[in-house]
From Swiss-Prot:
Molecular function terms from GO: RNA binding; structural constituent of ribosome
Gene encoding the protein: rps16
GO cellular component annotations of the record: cytosolic small ribosomal subunit
Listed name of the protein: Small ribosomal subunit protein uS9
Lineage of source species: Eukaryota, Metazoa, Chordata, Craniata, Vertebrata
Entries under Pfam families matching the protein: Ribosomal_S9
Quaternary structure, from the entry: Component of the small ribosomal subunit.
Family classification: Belongs to the universal ribosomal protein uS9 family.
InterPro entries xref list: Ribosomal_Su5_D2-typ_SF, Ribosomal_uS9, Ribosomal_uS9_CS, Ribsml_uS5_D2-typ_fold_subgr
Entry-linked PANTHER family: RIBOSOMAL PROTEIN S16, RIBOSOMAL PROTEIN S9
Amino acid sequence: MPAKGPLQSVQVFGRKKTATAVAHCKRGNGLIKVNGRPLETIEPATLQYKLLEPVLLLGKERFAGVDIRVRVKGGGHVAQVYAIRQAISKALVAYYQKYVDEASKKEIKDILIQYDRTLLVADPRRCESKKFGGPGARARYQKSYR
């Protein structure tokens, strides 16, 4: 058990489409849970690897001193996974900036951005709204001349 001191924690969110994941990162011993369940229980396995990307990129030793708990809601399965991985990455960067040192935070940030920018920067694309005169955002109803 770590020494009892002031509570060191950061709260960060990750977003993708309508999915929002809120990550609480505090001093601990390497626990990462999503909605109260460990990452290993996420199905299917391909999406599980997407979630593990930040851990695999940075190595387990960087996550060893922190516990990350993520709550996620909204969106579909894939959007939720992308929101979670963004929240985990941003939480670690924020924790290192606030409680560790700037150099290691910059190192982590550079590794993540070099691999995939969406790990730290939200994707601004949203669904375009439907307009009148057609069944969707851009498609028009069929026109008949006779």
